[in-house]
Amino acid sequence: MNTFLIDYQQIQSPAKGFSKLFVDYASEGEARQELTSNFFHYDYRHEADYYKLLGSLSSKSFAREALRDLLLRQNREYGVAEEHLQLLEKIRSPRCMTIVTGQQPGLFTGPLYTIYKALSAVVIAERQKAMFPDYDFLPIFWIESDDHDFEESACTSLFRGSTRQEIILEPWNRLPGQMVSRSPIGPSIRQCLDTLVESLHESDYREDIITKLNEFYREETTLDGGFARTMAWLFRDYPLFFLSPGDPAFKKLSVEVFFRELSTCPEASHTVIAQSSRLEEKGYSAQAKPRTVNLFYINDHNQRQKIEQVDRDFFALSPGKQRYSRHQILEMCGDHPERFSPNVILRAIVQDHVLPVFAYIGGPGEISYLAQYRRTYEHFGLKMPFIIPRGSFTLIEPVVSRIMDKVMQKSGRPSLSRKHMYQTAFHDMAALQKNAIKGGDNHDYDALFDRTAEALARELLALRPALVQLDPTLEQSLMGTSKQAEKALDTLRQKTQRANRRKHDELLGQIDKSAMHLFPGGVPQERVVNIFYYLNKYGPGLIDELAMVLRAHSTESHIALEL
């Protein structure tokens, strides 16, 4: 497998690239230094920070016995191998830290970046163990089971021939705002599985994939349950553990954060707003929008209701008419912490309060909004862990590699490399198409017409002195003739471009096909395509290959990987 590192600054996909904040965070130079020192507590590039964080986490108290019991119970249910489950005993020791990543549950695991997050957590845990052999680092995948965005969780897509096949799970007996973890998938999962089966070509691996997904996704299964079991199966050879924070046992461990939020709101939101203003002053965009109360209340129908602060000491649930005093809602939280759920602002705070988190592995969007939380962490008496970018890949199939070779040949520039072609494709696919047309017959028609237009304008202008001397009224005719000539030449240019495009339609069609594979729907492949398209073609060993590539490279560059 050939790998090519692409700088995030070079990636400008048709619909959406990467945020300025993330690009700066993954780069070198003063902008990054200013960003990390002002908006994060630790910098994973600074060796001294590792010892500070190890000392801080080792001396801090966590409910480690309860964590061991919770993780053991959940991961045994998800099907994690017993040999890996034994490693969970290590979390009882103050010298054991966690490397955390996470995502809301996705249908059949959702987009590729979910897999890349999990692999990144495993590989970075390995690196930390190699650096600090006296400590242990457990990779944990946080499954956002409290999430209520069913539409985002219930869809995925695969390539099917020359098109992209979307698979969408229809909601079944769902109420608005209902958490994805609290309701069965329902009968439409059958149609989803059938569509998946039809989309997978015959291969040596197809039958095993179909069998397992039929086992993990049944009508009575929840989305997070199917997701966890599928991920545990895919990563069965790795000591990766899963955590569902919707578990009542986990909510008990989170209650201190809930209490502080309800007791001091809206102070936490003010910290986010203040930090967001500083970000915007530096030219960055604020991603996360805080609420007055950054908690939801879970009602009897498993719907997440917003908690609104009506005035200083009274709260209301929305939608609904229930009103509670601050004392009442604190009492409710103490008696039933499982009824409360953090929003995007408090999720990271809860995570780092309950778990001894050494590093969080985040995607571009997550890193952007985590930059808003430094003061919020301090409000809850915490410091942020290392925030490390996840691995980022574009998987390039042989057919796309061959198309790139054709473009290189057509360009008339034998010195070009595949890396250059990929860099051009990731930066500006239209430029790649234009270069292919230009190089196809060694004629740069744009330059040819530009030279002709300049020469024609020059020659017509040379007529002016003689014509004006003969008859001043001829100057107006000359100007009209110049405009007509310019218009006629432009019309001829457009006809030439269309003729040239027709001549190269086959190659341009192939470039369009490669664009569909690299940027389906105009966004990076990793945000759209499902892993099972590739596992069906290239086998389960692909997971190991991706892990090997991650071990060999930093996660601060995008990796174009030829399969």
Swiss-Prot record:
Any GO MF annotation of the entry: ligase activity
Report the sequence similarity comment from the record.
Answer: Belongs to the BshC family.
- Keyword flag Ion transport: no
Spell out the InterPro entries in the cross-references.
Bacillithiol_biosynth_BshC, CC_BshC, Rossmann-like_BshC
Sorted keywords for this record are: Coiled coil, Ligase
EC number(s) on file: 6.-.-.-
Which named protein is this? Putative cysteine ligase BshC
Classification via Pfam families = CC_BshC, Rossmann-like_BshC
The disulfide bonds in this chain are none
From which residue to which does any coiled coil extend? 474-506
Q: Which organism is it from?
A: Prosthecochloris aestuarii (strain DSM 271 / SK 413)
The protein's superkingdom reads: Bacteria
